């Protein structure tokens, strides 16, 4: 399935690229979320007319993400959780908890932007958490988990 990308997609292409993707990925993700359009002659012409507008919108999103990344770089978030004697938490700290703590600190972060590659946090301590704000912008936040 050939599509024209309407925004930068990680590991796929940039705005305006004509890409070949599997039909399911195109129909179930890229097209419904407005990230791409079918690569027909009419859509190519319409895209070229809107190219400047789309590039400006993409630049605005990236600038916004970079400003949020600068704010996040300065933050250190402390989360309190109940823990046992050896520092093992009763439960865990997930992406939702971290996103809520960052939002409470003054920087709006969605749960889907927080990346925990090793799974949820289950121990007391300091952790560096990646926050993926844009396809080209990622920030690292120090999260301190303390026992209640």
Swiss-Prot record:
Official protein name in the record: Large ribosomal subunit protein bL9
Segments crossing the lipid bilayer: none
Keyword Repeat carried by entry: no
Reported function: Binds to the 23S rRNA.
An example Gene Ontology molecular-function term: rRNA binding
UniProt KW keywords: Ribonucleoprotein, Ribosomal protein, RNA-binding, rRNA-binding
A GO BP entry: translation
Provenance organism: Pseudomonas fluorescens (strain Pf0-1)
Family (UniProt): Belongs to the bacterial ribosomal protein bL9 family.
Gene3D superfamilies noted in UniProt: Ribosomal protein L9, C-terminal domain, Ribosomal protein L9, N-terminal domain
Family annotation (PANTHER family): 50S RIBOSOMAL PROTEIN L9 (PTHR21368)
Lineage, opening ranks: Bacteria, Pseudomonadati, Pseudomonadota, Gammaproteobacteria, Pseudomonadales
Stored InterPro entries: Ribosomal_bL9, Ribosomal_bL9/RNase_H1_N, Ribosomal_bL9_bac/chp, Ribosomal_bL9_C, Ribosomal_bL9_C_sf, Ribosomal_bL9_N, Ribosomal_bL9_N_sf
Cellular component terms (Gene Ontology): ribonucleoprotein complex; ribosome
């Amino acid at each position: 399935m050939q599509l024209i990308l309407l925004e930068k997609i990680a590991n796929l292409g940039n705005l305006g690229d004509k890409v070949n993707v599997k039909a399911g990925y195109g129909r179930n993700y890229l097209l419904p979320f407005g990230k791409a359009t079918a690569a027909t002659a009419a859509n190519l012409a319409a895209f070229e007319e809107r190219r400047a507008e789309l590039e400006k919108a993409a630049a605005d999103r990236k600038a916004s993400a970079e400003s949020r990344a600068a704010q996040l770089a300065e933050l250190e978030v402390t989360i309190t959780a109940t823990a046992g004697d050896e520092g093992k938490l009763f439960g865990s700290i997930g992406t939702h908890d971290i996103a809520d703590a960052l939002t409470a600190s003054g920087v709006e972060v969605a749960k889907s932007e927080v990346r925990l590659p090793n799974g949820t946090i289950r121990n007391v301590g300091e952790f560096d958490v990646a926050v993926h704000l844009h396809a080209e912008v990622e920030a690292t936040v120090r999260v301190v988990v303390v026992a209640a």
